């Protein structure tokens, strides 16, 4: 089984378990928080991801941590399963797929907007309203910064890329100029 299928299977299984108790959003918040804790702590990440650390030691440490947290039993069991199967390294990918499943179930499109600098709240709202009007769909926007686009914005959703950047425009002009033949 390839990595993408494995990630998809774990995310779908977690989502379906959350769906049974109608706690999809709560589980999403908890696994996102858990993933942030792991990603932000070098020591925890090193411990969980290291093949040199015995699985039993990882499980024992995890079980002692569970007693001090208020995470849902589904989240605790899920992370325990990842530890037992040596799959903790794909947790961030699982969180990403889980989020997509959650948005799809709520009929919300995920849209990534890339700009050269941080957009003001009014600009973000304007972009969101324009995109929602065009797609006739509710959206959840994620804003990223990329200085290489020089100016403008790039919008990504589903398999669609809308490039309104200066870099994209220059690349289009360059492509057209390559096709021009001088007599």
Swiss-Prot record:
It is a peripheral membrane protein. GO terms for cellular component: plasma membrane; proton-transporting ATP synthase complex. InterPro entries: ATP_synth_OSCP/delta_N_sf (IPR026015), ATPase_OSCP/dsu (IPR000711). Pfam families: OSCP. Keywords: ATP synthesis, Cell inner membrane, Cell membrane, CF(1), Hydrogen ion transport, Ion transport, Membrane, Transport. Belongs to the ATPase delta chain family. This is ATP synthase subunit delta. It comes from Rickettsia prowazekii (strain Madrid E). The gene is atpH.
